[in-house]
Amino acid sequence: MEPPKAIVKKPRLVKLGPVDPGVRRGRGFSLGELAEAGLDAKKARKLGLHVDTRRRTVHPWNVEALKKYIERLREAGVEV
């Protein structure tokens, strides 16, 4: 079972003005996202998830992806 990838917003460039730059794959999930999903950094790394300790944002789509992944692991019989 493939672990989910973190999705983060691209940096906003001043020369482009107020245009939304979109999203991209991130380095890992933030500690806040892990906490909302009920995990800590050590447990997340054991489950094969990447953790980015520098990032402070909490994106709802990442929290939802983590919750779905944990649910699939529990259905497969993995202790979370």
UniProtKB/Swiss-Prot annotation:
Entry keyword annotation includes Magnesium: no
Record-linked InterPro entries: Ribosomal_eL13 (IPR001380), Ribosomal_eL13_CS (IPR018256)
PROSITE patterns for this protein: RIBOSOMAL_L13E
GO cellular component assignments: ribonucleoprotein complex; ribosome
Molecular function via GO: structural constituent of ribosome
Top-rank taxon, per record: Archaea
Keywords from the UniProt entry: Ribonucleoprotein, Ribosomal protein
Keyword match Ribonucleoprotein: yes
Protein's GO biological process: translation
Similarity field: Belongs to the eukaryotic ribosomal protein eL13 family.
Name by which UniProt lists this protein: Large ribosomal subunit protein eL13
